[in-house]
Amino acid sequence: MYLQGFGNYHHSEAVKGALPPNQNSPQHCSLGLYAEQLSGTAFTRPRHNNLRSWLYRILPTVTQGTYYPYEFNIMQPFVDELSPNAMRWSPLYNSSQIKCDFVEGLFHIAGSPLVNTYTYYCNHSMSDKYFANNDGELLFVPYAGEIHLHTEFGKLMLSSGSIAVIPRGVKFKVEVISKEAKGYLCENSGNPLTLPQLGPIGANGLANPRHFQYPVAAFENSGSEHTIICKNQKKLWFTVCNHSPLNVVAWHGNYAPYCYDLSLFNTINTVSFDHPDPSIFTVLTSESEIPGVSNLDFVIFPPRWMVAEHTFRPPYFHRNYMNELMGLVYGEYDAKKEGFIPGGISIHNCMTPHGPDYESYEIAASQDLKPNYINSLAFMFETKDYWQVTEQAYRHPSRQMDYLNCWQGFKIEFSQ
């Protein structure tokens, strides 16, 4: 069961009477609870993008204890001098017999001043272990397996083809439902993700607000030992407390985790000719200080009909002002016939040329242009700042050193 609607002011209580009926902070909360506000923006942000929630807890967060350095380097150093070459990786993970939870399975791929991208692998649930990110919100894009995200606000269920966002500072743990789970993770330290403006598209289309789902209140009331791991200023810290941090019995507000089924994305595409720009596939965006230039765009290339007439239908050859990190959830990407599979990654930074490989080009340039259904789901994390690649990703054996060869079949066909 979920609450529906992106950015709505929701309220939920796991025990009847836990929510104060007429105010936020009564002198004495009912059921012996404590009132605590969680702010996602400054108090004085305009009303339409002011984010906060009130939580009614068994114990306030100040009782969590003292944090100490945690011996795990989640942030990895970047390559000092990064070439303008296109880069691509095969999936980093194979199945492991070693127990590995969500935090232990994080692999830092690349970053920019306000955005970082990781992959995750886990085959073991976080039973009495919790995670929070003070540096930014987390966008989950799974490509294999199923997980449940148990958060301070309630539970989200997540599998391939769906996404979830955990806001900055919200504590959660990952329960692995399948044998193992794999996915992509994007950390956004800029403005919180929101729905893009639709412009001439109109009032409806792309990701509709009604399809975003928020958790109903659920709580843990355990007196055993619990470990909280917190990412703060690019480092991990831990504390051990004698209660679960997921002790919120009721809440109300508009700052909360949410999930979304990508199959509900209302895809906009041409019904005449040419390939529209990929901005029409934007699901969520983090606005920067420059209008129309995003700190982060989350873009998908979902299952869709291709019907353009007298047109080269795959994505065109391109050199871009923005910086692209791509992944594949399932299927075969229509611009890459080989080498780009679920779990893979490609990075094309500002002005780095990219486009269909030679085999894809040959097929698309000569095919009979009947309506064609593309049954795949690729995505892109697009930023205004260069993706700096970590040393561990740059030197990882899954990096395809021969990636540029996919364009070497092109030959001069110009004639006067």
From Swiss-Prot:
One GO cellular component term: cytoplasm
Coiled coil regions, renumbered to chain: none
Keywords on record: Dioxygenase, Iron, Metal-binding, Oxidoreductase, Phenylalanine catabolism, Tyrosine catabolism
Binding site for homogentisate: Y333, H354
Single Gene Ontology MF annotation: homogentisate 1,2-dioxygenase activity
Signal peptide: none
Alphabetical list of InterPro entries matching this protein: HgmA_C, HgmA_N, Homogentis_dOase, Homogentis_dOase_bac, RmlC-like_jellyroll, RmlC_Cupin_sf
Pfam family, one: HgmA_N
Annotated active site: H275
Enzymatic reactions: homogentisate + O2 = 4-maleylacetoacetate + H(+)
EC numbers, comma separated: 1.13.11.5
Cofactor(s) needed by this chain: Fe cation
Keyword Metal-binding among UniProt keywords: yes
Listed CDD domains: cupin_HGO_N (cd07000)
Domain of life, source organism: Bacteria
Chain sites annotated for binding Fe cation: H318, E324, H354
SUPFAM superfamilies the record matches: RmlC-like cupins (SSF51182)
GO BP field: L-phenylalanine catabolic process; tyrosine catabolic process
Pathway it works in: Amino-acid degradation; L-phenylalanine degradation; acetoacetate and fumarate from L-phenylalanine: step 4/6
Cross-referenced NCBIfam families: hmgA
HAMAP family: Homogentis_dioxygen (MF_00334)
Job of this protein: Involved in the catabolism of homogentisate (2,5-dihydroxyphenylacetate or 2,5-OH-PhAc), a central intermediate in the degradation of phenylalanine and tyrosine. Catalyzes the oxidative ring cleavage of the aromatic ring of homogentisate to yield maleylacetoacetate.
Record's subunit section: Hexamer; dimer of trimers.
Family: Belongs to the homogentisate dioxygenase family.
Name by which UniProt lists this protein: Homogentisate 1,2-dioxygenase
